[in-house]
Amino acid sequence: YGLVGSEMCIRDRLNFTSASTALLRIEADTAEDLLFSGSQWGKDITVSVEQNSVIARHPSGETVTVTFTPNVELAKTDNNYTALVRSPRYPVNVAISFFTSEKEMTANLQNLPSLLNNPAPALQANAERWEGYLTKILRKDMKPEYDRIAVKAVTTLISNWRTHRGGLLHEGIIPSHAVGYFVGFWAWDSWRFSAGTAKFDPELAKNNIRAMFDYQQPDGMIIDCIYTDPSENNARDSKPPLVCWAVDEIFTHTGDTAFVAEMYPQLLSYYRWWYEKRDHNRNGMCEYGATDGTLEAAAWESGMDNAIRFDGAVMLKNEGYEDAWSMDQESVDLNAYLALECKLLKKFSSLLKIPFDAPDYSSQVADYFFDKNINFFCDRRLKDGSFIEEPGCEAYTPLWTRIATQAQVDSMLPMLQDTAKFSTYIPFPTIAADNPKYNPRGYWRGPIWLDQTYFAIRGLRNYGYNRLADEYTLQVFDRLSGLKEGAPIHENYGTHTGERLKAPHFSWSSSHLLMMYDDYGK
């Protein structure tokens, strides 16, 4: 991008050359001197000038360095610096680096002079990396405006890629770099990111999964979210089980049986955990819950923090454990996910030639949760088995996981195609749009979340409704505000308007847009 002043136009470009270093290239239309300085240093930061580098040290041991070529005149001023480039020859190259320790900084600073003096190989590698991503993603039969959506989705995912640091023992993808509270790794977010990146960066996809399993509990539980500071991790709840799907996507694109073998025991342990600590009445149908007995954490475990279906829920202690609590309702989406996990675990066990030894209730889920009174999938109350008739996005999951019967899906079509309920301006909201509790800005009580919209669209495709699935896909692509233009991809959107709502630059929306793009017309 460029900065235009009254007498000068400055253009700069930033390219990552490694996980820790970005190369800043600066050009201007005159030969006037350039003066650089820092601003807004944190109060705990100590700034020093050492040889050709400005080093900003944090008490934690982390450092940021800004390294110049030898012809730049560096000076320290108070707790700041100046860098003067006299009669510059363009481009001016500057290396900006982040290191987690003094040792790491010392080892890497010695590599920067060669980068600054001859950046061409690193820039070529960067260009080839991006070309590789896009070659694997882009189709030859899509309109340019839809290709732009796919490129924007890839760019969003890669811009949210973070290297290992502190308590994050593997690299991975954060939900959004633009929002301070989204700078960790979440479980079901990570499964989506890995499924979305498996096609164009499978190694990143693998490490994203490994990062969450670094904190697998002794009983098999995968905790909700992890941070660079492990004291901030949330182990009160898990998240919906989609990880076997992510592993299978990686296997589909790589054929990497070694990765399947690495993950299988951990996947099996996590799958068993659900039936051990989230099946209150031991009937094979699980509930969302928490380790601490709070409804807040149990709702977080569903991933749908304030969903209308949980408005009347209460918590029940599960017999035999101090850290096992369930909501008093069995959830259709959870058990549909578990049915898919079971199917894929069986696939993996066959691939690895080892017996599958875990509960299998997958054949019972669809009939158990199908409410014939309204021809829709619903959660059920534990106390009497009655259905919680608040039709919502959880009903899309049996279609996506392919456990519904064709007759069930056919009978759902009138409600799914009702423009007052689910066939809205942007299709497939989190709750039927005519529900009295529907809130257009209510997070999981009305807005569009693109994972759920994807589950519905792919679900229709799974049962032969391809033309309808394509129509809904184009509604998403054409109607979401700014999607085909320059606006960032957001966390969720307005059901009746397509307006951008919560966090921008959102990874899981990007993953599912890539999936819609890939599925269209197939």
Identify what each model region corresponds to.
Residues 196, 246-250, 341, 348, ...:
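Core register positions within helices of long alpha-helical scaffolds
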Residues 183-216, 394-405, 453-466:
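Alpha-helical support elements that line or immediately flank enzyme active sites
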Residues 1-5, 10-12:
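Single conserved hydrophobic/aromatic residue that forms the stacking wall/gate
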Residues 108-129, 145-152, 201-214, 257-275, ...:
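Extended, well-ordered alpha-helical scaffold segments
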Residues 141-184, 209-233, 283-330, 363-448, ...:
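Extended glycan-interaction surfaces of carbohydrate-active proteins
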Residues 6, 219-241, 245-259, 500-503:
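Aromatic/His-enriched, Gly/Pro-containing loop or helix-boundary segments
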Residues 244-247, 335, 342, 453:
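TPR repeat positional signature
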Residues 19-183, 258-259, 268-271, 275, ...:
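Acidic/polar, glycine-enriched structural segments that form the non-catalytic walls/loops
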